[in-house]
Amino acid sequence: VGVLVVNAATVPTRRDESWRYSDLEAVASVWPVPAAELIEVAAGEHVSRVVVQDAAIDAVAIRDFRVVLHKGATATFHVLNTGGKLGRVAIDVTCHEGSHFELGGAMLGGGDQTLEIVTTLNHIEPNATSNQVVRSVLSGRATGSYLGKVAVSRDAQKTDASQSVKAMLLTRTATANAKPELEIYADDVKCAHGATVGELDAMALFYLASRGIAPAEAKVLLLQAFVAGAFAEIADEAERATVEAAALAALERMLDMSLPQETRASPKTPLPLAGGAGGGPVL
């Protein structure tokens, strides 16, 4: 029997706010984690990143990013978090004057998975904006957590920051945690956040069934529509197709685990990820 020995002083605990919902035993098994990847965007430039976290189901996958946006710079992140016993993506962003950060993220998990998206937006100069859209679909005993802090300094007047967080629970044993947080020291800002947790709309399922669509396939279609808002802005068609295929595969796996073999759906072509952040008639 192996014994795991770690430096307890360095491993996160429940007292660490950004780790409060995490699988700390899994974290300890890979601690210390690599340093955050630094992405520095020069004034007026743009960076776009697509992160697909689909590690093996027994893996521990922790990815950290540190983003610095100089004057007028923009960055767009799209995150699909589906893999691992623990799958965690953390992004720390510093926004200088007139910069913009955009996040579209989704967590799709089942079984005993713990999935996390953790963000910190530091607005330190005026006229910067940020927008975050996160969607979760959870089944089994999975836990999906979004922790997003927006910190606005005294000099960051005219900040405009928003967070939209929605979760869909396919089983009553799944857990969704949402903790949008605002820390504002400026007096001329616009900051908004919203978080909801729900289930598939029975009326929407009934409507699709009345059109001859099998129940399992109907669920996949509705769930695809639900997560669509997180990825609608991916400009590169190849990247969008990659994320779309990975999301569809994750949704089908989740539903397959809870359905008899004869009722399982196998859509041949994923829906295009289009639509507004509301994600269709499912919440």
Model-identified regions with their sequence ranges:
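Glycine-biased, low-complexity coil/linker segments
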Residues: 263-265, 274-277
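Divalent metal-cofactor coordination and adjacent catalytic microenvironments
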Residues: 17
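Positively charged, low-complexity intrinsically disordered regions
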Residues: 21, 50, 262-265
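N-terminal cationic leader/targeting segments used for protein routing and processing
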Residues: 269-270
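Conserved beta-strand/loop scaffold segments within soluble protein domains that form the structured core
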Residues: 4, 8, 12-14, 23-213, ...
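Intrinsic disorder at enzyme termini
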Residues: 1-4, 254-259, 263, 283
